[in-house]
C-alpha cells in the first residue's frame, strides 16, 4: 500500500514537472482546457495555466472595458477555440491587441486575431475558430459548446471523401488561396518557425 501511494505521488509530481505553461494576457479568461472547465484553482498567479505536453485545445474569452459614446462599457467576446501543440516545459504566452472603443471591439469580433508565442517571442502555430452563439448569452455552457464543435468536426472528417493528391503536383499558391484565414495564419506561423 505504501509503495502504491509513493508511486502515485511520483506520477503526480512528474506530470506537473513536464507540464507546459500558458500565460494569458490579463483580459483573457480560460474557459475550457482540453474539454474540461477551468476552475480558479487551476489559474495560477499572473493568469497562468498548466498544459499537458502535446496537443491542446483551449477555449478563451476576452473581457475588456471599452468606450462607447463617451461611456465605459464591458465588452465580452465570443469564445475562441485554439488548438496547438505544446512541448514539455514550454512557456507560452497568448495575447491580443487591446481595443479602446466599441468599434475596435466589433472589428475584433468580426475578425479575431490573437498571438501565441514561446518564451523567446517566436510565434507558435495554432488553429483558431470562433464559437458564435446568437441571442442572450448570460449563462453559456462552454463545455457543451466545445463538445458539440468537436463532435461536428469529427462527423465532417468521417464523412469527407478521401482524395488522393500528389503533393508535388499541387501548386502551393493555389493551396494557400484555398485555406481559411485561420489556416493561412497557422501555415505562415509554421513556415516562419521552419525557415532554414
Curated annotation (Swiss-Prot):
Which Pfam family is an annotated match for this chain, by its short name? DUF2057
Q: Which residues form a coiled coil?
A: none
Q: Which UniProt keywords apply?
A: Signal
Q: Give the signal peptide range.
A: 1-19
Is rRNA-binding there in the keyword field? no
InterPro entries (alphabetical): UPF0319 (IPR018635)
Top-level taxon in the UniProt lineage: Bacteria
- What family does this belong to? Belongs to the UPF0319 family.
Q: What is this protein called?
A: UPF0319 protein VV1_0237
From which organism does this entry originate?
Vibrio vulnificus (strain CMCP6)
Amino acid at each position: 500500500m505504501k509503495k502504491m501511494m509513493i508511486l502515485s505521488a511520483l506520477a503526480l509530481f512528474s506530470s506537473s514537472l513536464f507540464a507546459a505553461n500558458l500565460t494569458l494576457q490579463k483580459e483573457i479568461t480560460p474557459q475550457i482546457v482540453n474539454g474540461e472547465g477551468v476552475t480558479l484553482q487551476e489559474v495560477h498567479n499572473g493568469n497562468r495555466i498548466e498544459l499537458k505536453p502535446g496537443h491542446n485545445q483551449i477555449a478563451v474569452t476576452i473581457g475588456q472595458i471599452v468606450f462607447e459614446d463617451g461611456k465605459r462599457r464591458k465588452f465580452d467576446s465570443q469564445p475562441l477555440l485554439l488548438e496547438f501543440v505544446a512541448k514539455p516545459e514550454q512557456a507560452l504566452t497568448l495575447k491580443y491587441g487591446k481595443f479602446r472603443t466599441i468599434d475596435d471591439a466589433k472589428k475584433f469580433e468580426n475578425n479575431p486575431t490573437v498571438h501565441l508565442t514561446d518564451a523567446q517571442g517566436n510565434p507558435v502555430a495554432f488553429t483558431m475558430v470562433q464559437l458564435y452563439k446568437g441571442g442572450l448569452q448570460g449563462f453559456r455552457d462552454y463545455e457543451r459548446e466545445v463538445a458539440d464543435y468537436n463532435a461536428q468536426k469529427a462527423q465532417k472528417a468521417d464523412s469527407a471523401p478521401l482524395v488522393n493528391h500528389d503533393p508535388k503536383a499541387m501548386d502551393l499558391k493555389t493551396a494557400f488561396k484555398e485555406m481559411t484565414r485561420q489556416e493561412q495564419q497557422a501555415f505562415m506561423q509554421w513556415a516562419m518557425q521552419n525557415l532554414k
